[in-house]
């Protein structure tokens, strides 16, 4: 029976319109599913209520595994010895103990088990695990132009088409976590700055067998193809060679990246990572709406990670997809060389900014020198992730060994939006920000980049206001003149 919903989960669902809520009564945790996602049968993500401790969560996880074992044992005894179909349930898969208080777990459970779980007082909600996939749109021949576009205010021409103007130290001291299919870490364009971080899908190899993650990594930090040419790259593999995976694996990948970031922060504070300036992350992937994934991404941002996520390639409202609908990340739509919204790019109020995403050339798999040209918001998001790393690296080092600037992800997001080139793109719906990413035109002075852009905005506003006032004054004087004229004639 759909309808009744515990009050604790209402705030979470306030912006999750594509969600279906299945709740049998008020004393049972609701089961959430997305109308635009492909569910994985009998697979769930369980999220604990706020206030539940790590100790209580561990006890609960042991409890649910015991129930699972007991139920499976009974099922095995009842099975017909001639039944060859594999009906076994795997039980607990991942545990989530996220910095800042997000606790939960995922697993493959029998309905009898999950019904007991949803009645446990510590459980806030349960979400059906679902498929996640890369957002690649098409493969076409072409030349790189995206870097040039984000370093020029004006529309590209033959003189600026292939000229990327940038600060040479861009990305230095910044770690970029690419949560995707992996990265070809031996590619020459990474100059030894790429490392394998973590493989989340069970039984998968530490290699990018798809190419999508490698392409994103190259746009972020490659020597030739990257925005932030000195950044470090860490491959976090959450999708398999096919380019698809599970929502629970993606959630676990985000947790791993955030934990790795916090370790780096700790090491820097101890003086063991001099020059460390922070961490950025890119997620050029998506699926249906997932309250859990959006929540976890926002939690990673809360602990200091700067996140860029792809808006999606459905030519639809980005708010209906995850992680595009996360509140605190930067959601990126795709633009073309002609300064149009790419025909496939999602849009809407959840889209924060646009970046080049059509015919983008970058690193690939197959050899240390392989390249490929592909399109999608998957290619736009790494431009913004690279810009996040680029701008972080321009921050002045503090007096301590921990050189992370006093700029939060929220402030960085606001600044990037404030300096973006405005109203240049065509085919932008009215509810979508018409903003195209800009890197400051090669300046290495972050404060001047931000201050100059805001000063220009103020000047433009003042100029526009003056023009309007002058027009009103002119209209007012004309009206007075006409009144006097009419009076004289009368």
Swiss-Prot record:
PANTHER family: CEREVISIN-RELATED, PEPTIDASE S8. Secreted subtilisin-like serine protease with keratinolytic activity that contributes to pathogenicity. Keywords: Glycoprotein, Hydrolase, Protease, Secreted, Serine protease, Signal, Virulence, Zymogen. Glycans are attached at residues 282, 456. Residues 27-134 form a propeptide. This is Subtilisin-like protease 8. Belongs to the peptidase S8 family. Pfam families: Inhibitor_I9 (PF05922), Peptidase_S8 (PF00082). One of its GO terms (cellular component) is extracellular region. The keyword Ion transport does not apply. One of its GO terms (biological process) is proteolysis. InterPro entries: PCSK9_ProteinaseK-like (IPR034193), Peptidase_S8/S53_dom (IPR000209), Peptidase_S8/S53_dom_sf (IPR036852), Peptidase_S8_His-AS (IPR022398), Peptidase_S8_Ser-AS (IPR023828), Peptidase_S8_subtilisin-like (IPR050131), Peptidase_S8_subtilisin-rel (IPR015500), S8pro/Inhibitor_I9 (IPR010259). Residues 43-134 form the Inhibitor I9 domain. Residues 144-450 form the Peptidase S8 domain. It is found in: Secreted. The active site is at residues 180, 212, 378. Its EC number is 3.4.21.-. The keyword Glycoprotein applies. It comes from Arthroderma benhamiae (strain ATCC MYA-4681 / CBS 112371) (Trichophyton mentagrophytes). Residues 1-26 form the signal peptide. Its main location: secreted. One of its GO terms (molecular function) is serine-type endopeptidase activity.
